[in-house]
Amino acid sequence: MTIGHYLRSMDQLTKQFTPSNYRDPKRQRLYLKDIDCPGAWADRLKETIPECVYYLNDCIESRTGGDGAVLEPNEYGQMRYGKGVAPAGDLMSSLPPEMRAENMMCYVGHEGTYTAAHREMCASLGHNIMIEASEDGRGEKAGSSIWFMTETKEREVVSEYFLSMLGHDIEVEKHFAQVNAWKKAPFNVWAVEQRVGDLILIPPLAPHQVWNRGTRTIKAAWNRTTVDTLELAIHEALPRARMVCRDEQYKCKAIIYYTLLKYSD
């Protein structure tokens, strides 16, 4: 099946689902998940999204004299403060290009497709923006996505709840929790409807899940690695990932090494 054929079939795929049969495992769900983001899309997003939260930004402020700036000679031999380290960035940019994990992705879904409850890989910061969706009319239903989000500080309670009450390990992305399960949860749950132009920021290690609605939703997503997320990855996320035999994709120790090299020069 080509992407064109898939896009033309989304209306038919959407019409399968009703409020009474959405849990039927026999219904066909075709979700284009984790596909490479087209270069033209990534370039346009780079022009729109603030640089400090965009993919592979190098953590350097545009102004001089920022936090961490040091005195250094300019082209005239005068000592001036250089550029400081920005409060946000993506330390994946410290790695040589051939070592970087490609995580600028796209998601194309229809009513009934979903992302099961999970946490972002290696405790990274997640970013998800809806760039296009169907609208009511011409045989289509308005597209949006429903997010169920939790907080980083309650991650242990969430993990225990999923394991003891729902019978699923949050480290294994296989279970989509029902609304009633979220209602009974002993922790805060944030339900958000994402529409075109909405940027969802996903905290590190915060379990979340997504349900797609309507005929079509198209989203772009990326992850960022920072000093704080690296600490969480080394001490918590990676040991848990090893317990379920999940490969490390982000080369966290290499990121630390190359970042120290970069900023010590």
Name the predicted role of every residue range:
Residues 2-198, 206-265:
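Active-site region of the double-stranded beta-helix
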